[in-house]
């Protein structure tokens, strides 16, 4: 009998996108974007299985041609996290197993980030983990960059689009406040992932438009792992050229 699988990487990939329809199929160096994400993810030694989760037959067909494991999910989900949960259910993931939500629009993702993200689960008390990196004072001014404040034990105190922590005294524009920018990669114990999908959207979540606040408001701790690795997502077609340059630099 084979050993039970304990760590899954799931890549949500939906076809519909207001800014970039068909984004998972966008050509990058001769292969669709989702393949590059899968290729990066499978380099993470912690994963027992990596699979695509999609609602679209065109993406599923392309995945099958390229030998990428694929799970078909419902078309309508409130978030990518809900799609990941459905895929994990279909894969029969055990409650104590770890499920990593790997953003499908991060084709230049450094696999070492995934290793860092999964590492805290050696502690059986950890239920959710995410990544953060140092921000300059200038970067922290943008509401598009989500900030996180971390407790002494490494758990998140709060996430915000505002510049936190606020520096009341001293050089407000300086870099001495230890600002951290959130990186939107999450790992969950399966039971915590299920709990997240069962909870209604919370007050702070709706205020900030940040779904991770649903966890904090309901007493579910999020372990924050610092990283120095950078990545670049694809929001619009013009981002593809940036990704191609990054891939050539990293793999050249």
From Swiss-Prot:
Query: Where in or outside the cell?
Result: Cytoplasm
Could you say which EC number(s) this protein's record lists?
A: 2.7.7.38
Q: In which pathway does it act?
A: Nucleotide-sugar biosynthesis; CMP-3-deoxy-D-manno-octulosonate biosynthesis; CMP-3-deoxy-D-manno-octulosonate from 3-deoxy-D-manno-octulosonate and CTP: step 1/1; Bacterial outer membrane biogenesis; lipopolysaccharide biosynthesis
Transmembrane regions listed in the UniProt entry: none
User: Pfam families of this UniProt entry?
Assistant: CTP_transf_3 (PF02348)
User: Carries keyword Transmembrane?
Assistant: no
Q: Which UniProt keywords apply?
A: Cytoplasm, Lipopolysaccharide biosynthesis, Nucleotidyltransferase, Transferase
Catalysed reaction, written as an equation: 3-deoxy-alpha-D-manno-oct-2-ulosonate + CTP = CMP-3-deoxy-beta-D-manno-octulosonate + diphosphate
InterPro entries for the chain: Cytidylyl_trans, KdsB, Nucleotide-diphossugar_trans
State the disulfide connectivity: none
Q: Which GO terms describe its molecular function?
A: 3-deoxy-manno-octulosonate cytidylyltransferase activity
A Gene Ontology CC term for this entry? cytosol
Give one GO biological process term. lipopolysaccharide biosynthetic process
Q: Family per UniProt?
A: Belongs to the KdsB family.
Q: Which NCBIfam families does the annotation name?
A: kdsB, PRK05450.1-3, PRK05450.1-5, PRK13368.1
Functional note: Activates KDO (a required 8-carbon sugar) for incorporation into bacterial lipopolysaccharide in Gram-negative bacteria.
Q: What is this protein called?
A: 3-deoxy-manno-octulosonate cytidylyltransferase
Highest lineage ranks of the organism? Bacteria, Pseudomonadati, Thermodesulfobacteriota, Desulfovibrionia, Desulfovibrionales
The encoding gene is: kdsB
